[in-house]
From Swiss-Prot:
Matches recorded under InterPro entries: PMP3
UniProt entry keywords in alphabetical sequence: Cell membrane, Membrane, Transmembrane, Transmembrane helix
Family membership: Belongs to the UPF0057 (PMP3) family.
Pfam families for the chain: Pmp3
Transmembrane segments: 32-52
Name recorded for this polypeptide: Plasma membrane proteolipid 3
Entry function: Plays a role in the regulation of membrane potential. Could mediate a proton leak.
Entry GO terms, CC: plasma membrane
Membrane topology: Single-pass membrane protein
Gene that this polypeptide is encoded by: PMP3
Domain of life: Eukaryota
Cell compartment(s), UniProt: Cell membrane
């Protein structure tokens, strides 16, 4: 399964701003809220790197 341009953009967004990466992948649901809270607490980057795309 090759990477597409949208996959690369999602990865970049997930590294820079983890909630945006989650929003692009999963939409607006509880995953986004959890990621926003974890980002505020400082662990959102770890969660984003562990989230399979």
């Amino acid at each position: 399964m090759p990477f597409t341009a949208s996959d690369i953009c999602k990865i970049i967004f997930a590294v820079i701003l983890p909630p945006l990466g989650v929003f692009l992948e999963r939409g607006c649901n509880s995953d986004l809220l959890i990621n926003i809270l974890l980002t505020i607490l400082g662990v959102g980057s770890i969660l984003a790197s562990m989230n399979p795309a």
